[in-house]
Amino acid sequence: MFVPSNIGWLVLSCGLFVAYWVLLAIYRLHFHPLSRYRGPRVAAVSNSWYEWYWNYYLNGQMIFEIQRLHKQYGPVVRIGVNDLSIDDPEVYQAMTKVSSGFTKDPHFYRCISFPGTSIGETDPAQSRIRRKVLTPALSGTRVQELAPAILVKVERLLRRVDLCAQSAKTICITSACKALTMDIISKIVLGREIGCIEEPDFRNSFIENLNAAFETGWIATAFPRLATLALWMASMSDFSSYLEVFDPHSAVYVAREDVNVPSAIAAHADRSAVIDMLMDPLTVKGHTVPSLEQLNDEAVILLTAGNDTTSNSMIFGLYQICNNMSVYKTLFQELQGHFPSVDQQITYEEAKQLPYLTATIKEILRLGTPLPGRLPRLIPSSGFQLYGQDLPPKTSIHTSPYLXNRHPSIWDNPNDFNPDRWLRKNSRDLDKYLATFNRGARQCLGKEWVHSYQIAGLWQD
């Protein structure tokens, strides 16, 4: 009787493994429901290595590769086993309607966020509750209340810039802008600022640790299990410096045995910061007070999202205005005409009425998209018809604010920085196609804050 040796078993196992992947590749390329759509064949066989190459190895270049693929193949490109990229403003409008039934793709969002947070929550019902809890802290009314404090922080930053200029010291505008926005968003989320503006060279370990953690996002979307292992290993080490900032604020609630007593909450929470609202069980019907770990997760997500997105747009805007003298002069003349003295108080509502300032900010947000990557959504159980073809439920449909804000059917000379496009007769039609803040039930809660940052920065600068 023949008894296979260890080498024989190894060869057999390898052969079966190779055969499995060959058959799987044949199925995905020729028999999968999405096989009719064109795109990179390697992506159709396996998302992981394709994403790793473009996003990690080439440092975030996948969105530009997808843009090239759309030019080659058209508005629909297969970019994964079960993934389609759509570059069509009208399809985007249909997908983002409140009644569309599209939901966040949990495979993607668990890689870039924490489960159960305002960004990471994929259940529509739970997401609505969390959004209702956070809305008061991020509303236009709250923007008005904190507008003077924002201007104080901008002035503090500019004083440091002036001191550097007097001593001929070079500063990093990226670090300066990120320090400003972090101090503002920490006030909104935690109830107090972290103090990044006062740090030497505007460098802060809190920001650097957050950036280091979220740089793993490129690996996470390609190899989710590896990312999970990396985060677990990080939690076992001393990589938790953000807790040193957040715990003093959350522990005062979590450590109390009477945390669910409304009177005790009311005595401690001024309801001005996100943490106060999260810890109040009466904030919204159906809201459950999160644990300390869940609070930390939400804080990290809000601080990171609020800092990176806003500061990147601000940096982009400053560059574009300084690089375009006609825009600079027109904007300066409008501001000087309405507010002759830099010491004059300017309110958020007054600034929103200035047409060229508003147009400039819209153009900054169009081209300097805070979140340029893909935002995948799952087709609902009822399915979805795309150009006459029925797509099966749970297919992941990817759209991108970067692509939507540059689509030539909507934007003439889409790569040109031109605030005047927002002052034409048909400019109101453009607003619904501005994909910067998403649309529908998933519209960005921080939209008003982004506008206020830009106004404060441009006015003072």
Curated annotation (Swiss-Prot):
Membrane topology: Single-pass membrane protein
Residues reported to bind heme: 444
Residues spanning the membrane: 7-27
Molecular function per GO: heme binding; iron ion binding; monooxygenase activity; oxidoreductase activity, acting on paired donors, with incorporation or reduction of molecular oxygen
Function of the molecule: Cytochrome P450 monooxygenase; part of the gene cluster that mediates the biosynthesis of the phytotoxin solanapyrone, a causal agent of early blight disease of potato and tomato. The prosolanapyrone synthase sol1 is a polyketide synthase that produces the octaketide desmethylprosolanapyrone I via sequential condensations of 7 malonyl-CoA units with one acetyl-CoA unit, and one methylation step. The octaketide backbone is further methylated by the sol2 O-methyltransferase to yield prosolanapyrone I.
EC number: 1.-.-.-
This protein's pathway: Phytotoxin biosynthesis
Cofactor(s) in the UniProt record: heme
A single GO cellular-component term on record: membrane
Superkingdom in the source lineage: Eukaryota
Encoding gene, per UniProt annotation: sol6
Swiss-Prot/TrEMBL keywords: Glycoprotein, Heme, Iron, Membrane, Metal-binding, Monooxygenase, Oxidoreductase, Transmembrane, Transmembrane helix
Record bears the keyword Membrane: yes
This protein's name: Cytochrome P450 monooxygenase sol6
Family: Belongs to the cytochrome P450 family.
SUPFAM superfamilies linked to this entry: Cytochrome P450 (SSF48264)
